[in-house]
């Protein structure tokens, strides 16, 4: 009987040690709906793969800074990552369409743009050893300003928060000084008096409690930037077929869920933003 028990234990041991572990890096805080969606994605993968693949989500720039994540995943320093798509514009120009003002004015428009972008982005990422999994938009971008804005002249000599080449160019055209500030550091930068305005989602304003310093919000719906989630292609190919299928299926579900979460955030943030002194 003891022999049978030992044989059974040895037979199970390889299964117990067969789990693959991935690190997924993101630059956004754990409370962000994007990160919560990532955590759900990771849980879905682990469950669907029967524990064969476990994905550990590292939020808040803890593993790599947001703009470093694509390179880190490409080099295999992390197996998966998330970044804002406009960070890819240098190597993937069509990703920059996300930050062209007033081309996209609704979630339906944003979905049509993603349908056009997706095959091209997937192909270009594949050429760099990356596999695109899914993309989810932020709520539309509005304008936060410490002082009222009546014309473009009001930006001259001020400091505008920027986070991609598109916002840098907008700041320059308005005569403002671009200030690169990650989303997780917005409140700190405002408290230190480093910013006068920023174009970002109302959600970012709510999450950072910016109304302590910023008194004006304009819902201009300038664009709908997307975050994209991707994996190292070699790491993906090394998975057994059932685990690969689990990743693909969970990614499709995460995309659907993420778009719904983004739209829901619009209603939430507009209810949460103070009715005054915002205009």
Regions from the PLM with identified roles:
Residues 12-13, 33, 278:
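Alpha-helical transmembrane segments and their juxtamembrane interfaces
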